Amino acid sequence: ICSEEGTRDGRGLSMFIYDKRQGGVDVRRIEHKLGIHGSPTCELVYKNAKAELCGDRKLGLIKYVMALMNGARLGIAAQSVGLSQAAYNEGLAYAKDRKQFGKAIIEFPAVYDMLAIMKGKLDAGRALLYQTARYVDIYKALDDISRERKLTPEERLEQKKYAKLADSFTPLAKGM
């Protein structure tokens, strides 16, 4: 991503593809972040680095990075649901196996309530993930169709509707 001359905000950013074997780029610093460390976030400094424009000028942030973010957010939401399911399964198994005062601790109201709340949040997160993925899929399908042929006015309205829904729901799903 690179800012274009004469712009002051994210609307002026363009996206470029760069071959690191050509040199000219240094990593200034790596961000220290919480969560998944397999994909580092870093600040890059370019010095006479040759790159190819990716897509259209000044649409790097708005169109391309946001599309990448929506995909990444869905992936994070799916990981969250999977981890939550595993945690619930472990907690449930433990509550059934662990005995206290001659009975399984799942029979104690406080433990049962904790597991019920955990299951409710898990089911809500899964539903949010599936609905968000549905919105993204419909938007992408209409986007693909628009590259093949001109969309009807109704299809264009649907495309805008599902783009807004996808853009609204993906940050929610990520924060599950």
Predicted features, each with a name:
Residues 1-25:
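A short core secondary-structure module
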Residues 19-28, 40-72, 89-107:
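A glycine-rich, basic-preceded beta-loop-alpha segment at the flavin cofactor/substrate interface
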Residues 9-14, 46-49, 74-78:
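Short C-terminal domain-edge/linker segments immediately following a structured domain
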